[in-house]
Amino acid sequence: MAEAGTGEPSPSVEGEHGTEYDTLPSDTVSLSDSDSDLSLPGGAEVEALSPMGLPGEEDSGPDEPPSPPSGLLPATVQPFHLRGMSSTFSQRSRDIFDCLEGAARRAPSSVAHTSMSDNGGFKRPLAPSGRSPVEGLGRAHRSPASPRVPPVPDYVAHPERWTKYSLEDVTEVSEQSNQATALAFLGSQSLAAPTDCVSSFNQDPSSCGEGRVIFTKPVRGVEARHERKRVLGKVGEPGRGGLGNPATDRGEGPVELAHLAGPGSPEAEEWGSHHGGLQEVEALSGSVHSGSVPGLPPVETVGFHGSRKRSRDHFRNKSSSPEDPGAEV
């Protein structure tokens, strides 16, 4: 049986498993590449002795049930130990666990108590405080802040820069005193105003309207319409285009612009209402034309005037001739 304190395997165990060195290692055990001279026997046992372990479990094999406890729990914690391994592997494992035990001994008792519970489990570390210990130490060594002194106003520190005004000699005023002061001021202003000033037109409230200027909208369109009606009435009188009229004798009749009136315009309505859309422009007798045959009845020329607006470009002036440049054909 291997001793728990030394960690060295016994000769009896090594002789018992000496024939099993050619077996392959288990998948659950892994070694580094540097351990080329090591071999893991198939019957190697891993043993971890914890404070809760029982003394009867050391002699029991892997297939045998553990024996009932026959004594008290060991007082000290025994290190981790593997049985059935080579001396090199056992030495490495012992060195590793010795370093861990040394680090645990060097740790302060308060840290060990907070990091490990009574049953061997790890506890969650305490949350850090709001300020670090270095910061708190620096604040502790710092001198207490002196009380803040309010700043001195500039008019106290430099009174020569300021001018002091006082209202001690001013009497208390009220609404009645303000009203009396205003009326006295207005009375003095009215007395100082000149009386021989002549107001311009429409400024005197007592005027009767003499000399006023009245602005009204011009009625040029209405007057032009009445004038046009009057001219058309004179043209439409009987006997205007007879033989006694010199204008008719020359073959020239009155020129009317009724065809330029737009639809719905007042001129078109007046033209249609008075003449019914049919206007006699000129009445010429047969003797006026040079090629007329005597004895024929006189011919009357009738012009039809519509209310549709036409462009002036389609009409030729009487003074222009087809031979003139720019004349329309």
From Swiss-Prot:
What quaternary structure, including any partners, is listed in this protein's UniProt entry?
Answer: Interacts in a RNA-independent manner with distinct U5 snRNP-containing complexes, the mono-U5 snRNP and the post-splicing U5 snRNP-PRPF19 complex. Interacts with SNRNP200; the interaction is direct, excludes recruitment of C9ORF78 and WBP4 to SNRNP200 and negatively regulates its RNA helicase activity. Interacts with PRPF8; the interaction is direct.
Question: Phosphoserine is carried by which residues?
Answer: 60, 67, 86, 132, 143, 146, 265, 321
What's this protein's name?
A: U5 small nuclear ribonucleoprotein TSSC4
The cross-references to Pfam families, in alphabetical order and at most eight, read: TSSC4
Region (Hom3) residue ranges read 150-186
Region described as Disordered: 1-88, 104-156, 221-329
Q: Which UniProt keywords apply?
A: Acetylation, Cytoplasm, mRNA processing, mRNA splicing, Nucleus, Phosphoprotein, Spliceosome
> What biological function has been recorded for the protein in this entry?
Protein associated with the U5 snRNP, during its maturation and its post-splicing recycling and which is required for spliceosomal tri-snRNP complex assembly in the nucleus. Has a molecular sequestering activity and transiently hinders SNRNP200 binding sites for constitutive splicing factors that intervene later during the assembly of the spliceosome and splicing. Together with its molecular sequestering activity, may also function as a molecular adapter and placeholder, coordinating the assembly of the U5 snRNP and its association with the U4/U6 di-snRNP.
Organism, as annotated: Homo sapiens
N6-acetyllysine sites (modified residues): 217
